UniProtKB/Swiss-Prot annotation:
Lumenal side: 1-6
Organism domain of life: Eukaryota
Subunit-level organization: Homotrimer.
Region (C-terminal hydrophobic region): 175-222
Region (Important for ligand-binding): 97-104
Gene label: sigmar1
Organism: Danio rerio
Miscellaneous: Sigma receptors are classified into two subtypes (Sigma-1 and Sigma-2) based on their different pharmacological profile.
Membrane topology reported for the UniProt record: Single-pass membrane protein
Name of the molecule in the record: Sigma non-opioid intracellular receptor 1
């Protein structure tokens, strides 16, 4: 009887998880999104090759003009270290929701490692430096330069390498909470830099609050 109960519980759990995944997939396939990867890439490409700090300032100004209420204010912008997959970089989150994010990303030192495998599509447009990618199932790598956009498809895994001084604009679309395990695992279990963990969680929550506030305002609730 104990074995039967265990099997029944397992069936219920698997069934519940399957329904949850199907619901999320249906929701993501039919919801309206704020950004498109083409729009973000086109905007970033205008400033490729420029000094990255000046380029980022222009990108932020233009994003705020095009998407009012969806980009964090200056007082909430913060460069935060990211340790994941063996590499180390820094990000500045501009927008965050359950299904989208926009951020500035890069590194001041040579670094590389595993890309991670996500339930999300991620695209990066290079402003400065070089990015090298070795895709799963291939025997050769490709190198990308300022103005290039690299698309990391959902479920894909690659080896990644950035040269020092590589900076880019990144847009992600998918079930964003599913990416946090990879993004935070090294911080939690390797570097144990819990201050960085706090900074990361805080800015993501701020992005979620801003998005919720904008949604309620546009819906006429606030």
């Amino acid at each position: 009887m104990s074995l039967i109960r265990t099997i029944l519980k397992l069936v219920v759990v698997v069934g519940f998880l399957s329904l949850t995944v199907q619901f999320i997939r249906h929701w993501m396939a039919n919801k309206q999104y704020v950004f498109t990867k083409e729009e973000v890439a086109k905007l970033a490409k205008q400033y490729a090759g420029q000094d990255h700090e000046q380029a980022f300032s222009k990108v932020v100004v233009e994003l705020r003009r095009r998407y009012p209420g969806h980009i964090l204010p200056d007082e909430d912008l913060q460069w935060v270290f990211v340790n994941a997959g063996g590499w180390m970089g820094s990000m500045c989150l501009l927008h965050a929701s359950l299904t989208e994010y926009v951020l500035l990303f890069g590194t001041a030192v040579d670094t590389g490692g595993h890309s991670g495998r996500y339930w999300a599509e991620i695209s990066d447009t290079i402003i400065s430096g070089t990015f090298r990618q070795w895709k799963e199932g291939t025997t050769k790598s490709e190198t990308y330069y300022p103005g290039d956009t690299i698309v990391h498809s959902a479920g894909e895994a690659t080896s990644v390498q950035w040269s020092s001084g590589t900076w880019m604009v990144e847009y992600g679309r998918g079930f964003i909470p599913s990416t946090l395990g990879f993004a935070l695992a090294d911080t939690m279990f390797s570097t144990q830099d819990f201050l960085t963990l706090f900074y990361t969680a805080r800015v993501y929550v701020k992005g979620m609050i801003l998005e919720a506030s904008t949604f309620l305002t546009e819906s006429g609730v606030l």
